[in-house]
């Protein structure tokens, strides 16, 4: 039998944050991850709260959280103080900064808006260094979208047309720069075959990188905002972007593209390296299949696909297995389940109640708020019995819609730390009424 203090199930942002926080507290920690997480599909920014569950726009997320316990007691934020959520996010900033990936927020802790690949604006709270943080005033003479020849996952014409409709940008000239990356011809068999990873590898070559610099300087000036797809990554994306800024003296804005998202991959790689550097044990490419319980509701051990007959024991377990995309939740024709342990769920019983009649509805689809039911300590239940040493965090939780609210990142990080601290018996410092010290 393998023995640990804390075992974390899931390798997304919630899982890595939980595992890192546990190992910082001196706990022998293992993280079991099936493989690539939803971070490969993410924007690389951390959303905290763009809208309330009722649909009201939010500028100051921590102020908005204060009313959630009364209005939406089922929401994960209602089980933590706003100050704990805030400190959890700053903890993440410190962790990523140590790995060379700084994240930035506004000085007044309000939301800012990032320009999306579709040319819309999306509220978020933390962004990477080369993401333009828009509030209201635009200080640029022109906005120039970069179109890469042969790259199909970013459509500048669509983004340009959408951004022109926004009142904040109506006085700006919005244009397009067409660039060609040397070496692309050898990689593709048809005109639109390149992906972001392909271009990222090419731009490591000095000839390709210098050619991009020259083409950008030919069309853009220091008064412009150059909006380019995230095509620099594969381990050294920020280094190359800093070099690009030095050589061109241009203001750059990265937008995430169709998967794989290099902005999201940066966060996953940084968290993984941090966890391993701190001495954590990573079982990557493995899958938790089941658990063994005692009569009092304690999870005694878990079994994984790769370990076979060897059980894995821990004093406490953190379930950060994600939602539908990561198979932390599974939907069949007539029910939605948590597939590892069969935990009790919050979900509508009839399939017609899972969604709105209109796909592009102004209100949230109910199924997005389905998930595992937990108590105030983020402990789930199994057949009505509270699981004494299993804690849940991230998008496996019920009671919130991360897409509609724009709250996915904030909930993932804060509930991960809350789950770990409650697993270690620090629940008194975690109540909504009290301040939390990390």
Curated annotation (Swiss-Prot):
InterPro entries: FAD-dep_OxRdtase_2_FAD-bd, FAD/NAD-bd_sf, G3P_DH_GlpB_su, Metab_Enz_Cyan_OpOx_G3PDH
Cellular component terms per the entry's GO annotation: glycerol-3-phosphate dehydrogenase (FAD) complex
UniProt keyword Oxidoreductase, yes or no: yes
Keywords, ordered alphabetically: Flavoprotein, FMN, Oxidoreductase
Pathway(s) this gene product operates in, as recorded in its UniProt entry: Polyol metabolism; glycerol degradation via glycerol kinase pathway; glycerone phosphate from sn-glycerol 3-phosphate (anaerobic route): step 1/1
Gene3D superfamilies recorded: FAD/NAD(P)-binding domain
Catalysis: reaction(s): a quinone + sn-glycerol 3-phosphate = dihydroxyacetone phosphate + a quinol
GO BP: glycerol catabolic process
EC number(s) per entry: 1.1.5.3
Cofactor: FMN
A single GO molecular function term of this UniProt record: glycerol-3-phosphate dehydrogenase (quinone) activity
Record note on quaternary structure: Composed of a catalytic GlpA/B dimer and of membrane bound GlpC.
Function: Conversion of glycerol 3-phosphate to dihydroxyacetone. Uses fumarate or nitrate as electron acceptor.
Record family assignment: Belongs to the anaerobic G-3-P dehydrogenase subunit B family.
Matches recorded under HAMAP family: Glycerol3P_GlpB
NCBIfam families: glycerol3P_GlpB (TIGR03378), PRK05329.1-2 (NF003719), PRK05329.1-3 (NF003720)
Protein name from the UniProt record: Anaerobic glycerol-3-phosphate dehydrogenase subunit B
Biological source species: Vibrio vulnificus (strain YJ016)
